[in-house]
């Protein structure tokens, strides 16, 4: 694999031949001096390699396939599809309402039509009725839930707002201690930006600080790595609970306008939730 500079250098050392560039070029012996065309045929540049890895493009596919594969990005789609259906790691069924789609799978595993929300003539998000959760959330796991106008913690209607909720075990899966907490916020739909939301164990924020303090109340052998809800949207406050003796939520009402939901069975796998979110929404 060559850099662009190395490729140019090889071309300068090339010669003129009467050979026709084609598949036979790859079979030329090692002691033959190549023409510029033969150099281009044989060489693989770093840029070409990275372009292929980044896009893995499927240029001739139909529109309905492009929609499902992030515009032909087969590598991204394969990773996304694996996590969406990773029931060994996560409680079924994950919900991801992706922008630009017509239908999305609900908590029951059924495809339902997406309702889109517009603010100032801009489509901000889509949501679907949650449906009936296949099995209650349980165990010492961790989950991210995004709903439209329905706060799952306070059970209140938040008109014109996107409600983000992160729940997590503070103790390890192997620990005998039951300790949980949550962080949540309500974001005005006109300010909503998928790119400004993430779970973090390293970016300083109020939620991570609060979660760290809660984790540190446990004995060292029971502690998980603290993870918080990071929201980089002006004017939005993230609230974190005190420690709790049980999961903050175990189900989602069937009529809830749901945008995203994913819950790992074991808290140590929280990074899977972040990865699924990033694959689903980030550029």
From Swiss-Prot:
InterPro entries linked to this entry: VP9/VP10/VP11, VP9_N
UniProt main location, coarse: virion
UniProt entry keywords in alphabetical sequence: Capsid protein, Host-virus interaction, Viral attachment to host cell, Virion, Virus entry into host cell
Gene3D superfamilies referenced in this protein's UniProt entry, alphabetically: Reoviridae VP9, N-terminal domain
Entry's Gene Ontology BP terms: symbiont entry into host cell; virion attachment to host cell
One Pfam family it belongs to: Reoviridae_Vp9
Cellular location(s): Virion
Role summary: Spike-forming protein that mediates virion attachment to the host cell receptors and plays a major role in cell penetration.
Assembly and interaction partners: Trimers.
UniProt-recorded name of the protein: Spike protein VP9
Species the sequence originates in: Banna virus (BAV)
Species classification: Viruses, Riboviria, Orthornavirae, Duplornaviricota, Resentoviricetes
Gene: Segment-9
